[in-house]
Amino acid sequence: MSPPATEIKAVYEEQGYLSGVSILSTQELQDARDSFAALEREFGEEYTAYSLHNVHLKYDWVMMLAKHPRLLEVVTAVLGQDVLLLDSRFICKYPVLNHGSARNQGDKDTIPYTNGSGEREEKDLETNQKTDPGLPFVAWHQDMRYWGLDGGPVLSVWLALDDSKEDNGALQVIPGSHCSGMLPHHPSKRTGNMLSVNQEIPEELVQTENAVLCPLQAGQMSVHDGLLVHASDPNTSGRRRCGFVIRYVPTAAYPIQDPDRPRSFPATVLVSGEDKYHHFKNIKS
């Protein structure tokens, strides 16, 4: 049973995020994983790592995830009853078990650690990989840096298709950092940053000593505010880390012309309540 809406909203407004919220049943999770596996076979992992953008308009099963009642229960507790789905994307960090771009093609559900020397060797490899500048990671950033919006907050969901742990690059957040407003973002000096604009918040502005890891079991979700400072490390495990990222806004939000944040919104969907404002074109329902 979910906490009362008032409790959800209070924690979210104070901390800027919620984590470990159970959404999918065992069967729903298996169905979603099977459907995603079909896309991997069709398009290949290089494509499915980051290029499945706004496919909620193409695949019914993806739209069902974005409109899942338990998910929307949390979203509406934070944003109110009138909510738009703004944008969606699958993001996958595939396992990299050697330096370079080679990927493990084995069973993605298998935990590679074993007792004895196997565990020690794997952890040594993990240490080396975290210092490899080429491995995919997500730098410290705020989502709102890339969204030309005003009139309401952006809420981001990570719905986990795989377990998300420290060793495969789980989300890290700075609690309460959403209260500091927009921070400067500069071009990243490190290679491997998955952010398409390759920016990051300068390290001296990030209170990394306050960072909190947000591990998830497959079928759970985390949600965070568009101004929350967050990041994720490379996947140094032998397991995939895949999730469905969904952005929601209250219907009162509206796009703005900002040359630093150019953005179009061609895939908006009314997922709860009614839209009294009609700020976005081509809204689906």
Regions from the language model: what does each represent?
Residues 1-140, 145-148, 185-186, 259-261, ...:
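Non-heme Fe(II)-dependent double-stranded beta-helix
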Residues 10, 117-121, 164-229, 233, ...:
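Double-stranded beta-helix
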Residues 39-42, 81, 164, 180, ...:
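Phosphate/oxyanion-binding loops and surfaces in catalytic or ligand/nucleic-acid-binding neighborhoods
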Residues 42, 183, 221-223, 227-285:
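Non-heme Fe(II)/2-oxoglutarate
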Residues 58, 86, 153, 167-169, ...:
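Residues that flank catalytic or metal-binding motifs in active/ligand-binding sites
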Residues 81, 133, 144, 149, ...:
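Active-site region of the double-stranded beta-helix
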Residues 141, 148-166, 215-218, 223, ...:
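Short, conserved beta-strand element in jelly-roll/cupin
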